[in-house]
């Protein structure tokens, strides 16, 4: 045993060759590869994330669409563990370089040292103000994942920025019933984008949302607006940006 290994053992700190921060698809994939390559690996996951919100899994080869996000992540975690990796539930709050060039990761209950660190921490979507339907049942953040389910359905895109306008244009490939809901915010897109919006069958609704109605199965049925109108939608996409979890980088 080297002096470093002896010191680690004496301190009681767990040591690994690879520590992966983040237990979404990216982090678990990194953990699985590292473990199968023979590296002593730990995946530290705070929980939550986009994948955990999925009611059904789409666009993943070999995974049937009746698999929920939580089931998908659970299976991936089991795969890491079956090959000898550790999966720990904790929020990593600090990473610092040690004197010998390794990394010490601290969390609410975690204290580990690793030769290498992989950050798979993802990002968090900005949620609009309520009232809102349930995520996955009328409120959707991934256009590539969920646009297909709205073929020939009434769809909203929430926001007043360039992204909202361009997502509305994309949704016209799936349905001819697309509204942009600015919720009273000032338009931020360019004059060129305004011309694009005006040239397509998209309604821009400026009144804010004051109420919401759901169907018996929990899906969104309609929004109520401050001018008294009620508009029916199957679902839609809020476009308020994302916060990338880069604090540890």
Specify the residue positions occupied by each region the protein language model found:
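Conserved N-terminal glycine-rich FAD pyrophosphate-binding loop of Rossmann-like flavoproteins
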Residues: 2-3, 9-15, 33, 46-70, ...
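FAD-binding core/adjacent interface of flavoenzyme oxidoreductases
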Residues: 2-18, 87-153, 237-239
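Rossmann-like dinucleotide/flavin-binding elements
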Residues: 10-41, 142-186
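Hydrophobic/aromatic ligand-binding patch that stacks against planar heteroaromatic rings
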Residues: 29, 33-34, 117, 170, ...
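Helix-loop-beta segment of a Rossmann-like dinucleotide-binding subdomain
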Residues: 54-69, 102-104, 152, 174-183
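A Rossmann-like FAD-binding core segment of flavoenzymes
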Residues: 80-106, 111-114, 175-249
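Glycine/Thr-rich phosphate-binding loops of Rossmann-like dinucleotide-binding domains
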Residues: 127-128, 166, 246-247
């Amino acid at each position: 045993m080297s002096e470093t290994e002896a010191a680690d053992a004496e301190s009681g700190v767990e040591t690994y060759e690879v520590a992966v921060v983040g237990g979404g698809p990216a982090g678990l994939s990194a953990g699985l590869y590292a473990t199968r390559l023979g590296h002593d690996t730990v995946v530290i996951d705070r929980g939550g994330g986009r994948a955990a919100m999925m009611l059904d899994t789409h666009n993943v080869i070999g995974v049937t669409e009746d698999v929920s996000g939580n089931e998908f992540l659970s299976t991936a975690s089991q795969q890491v563990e079956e090959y000898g990796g550790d999966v720990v539930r904790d929020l990593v709050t600090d990473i610092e370089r040690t004197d010998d060039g390794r990394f010490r990761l601290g969390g609410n209950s975690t204290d580990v040292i690793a030769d290498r660190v992989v950050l798979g921490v993802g990002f968090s979507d900005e949620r609009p103000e309520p009232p809102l339907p349930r995520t996955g049942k009328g409120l959707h953040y991934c256009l590539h994942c969920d646009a297909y389910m709205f073929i020939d359905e009434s769809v909203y895109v929430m926001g007043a920025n360039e992204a909202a306008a361009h997502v509305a244009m994309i949704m016209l490939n799936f349905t001819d019933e697309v509204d942009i809901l600015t919720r009273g915010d000032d338009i931020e897109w360019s004059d060129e984008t305004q011309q694009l919006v005006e040239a397509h069958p998209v309604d821009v609704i400026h009144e804010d949302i004051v109420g919401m109605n759901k169907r018996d199965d929990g899906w969104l049925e309609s929004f109520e607006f401050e001018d008294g109108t009620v508009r029916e939608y199957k679902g839609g996409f809020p476009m308020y940006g994302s916060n990338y979890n880069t604090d540890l980088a």
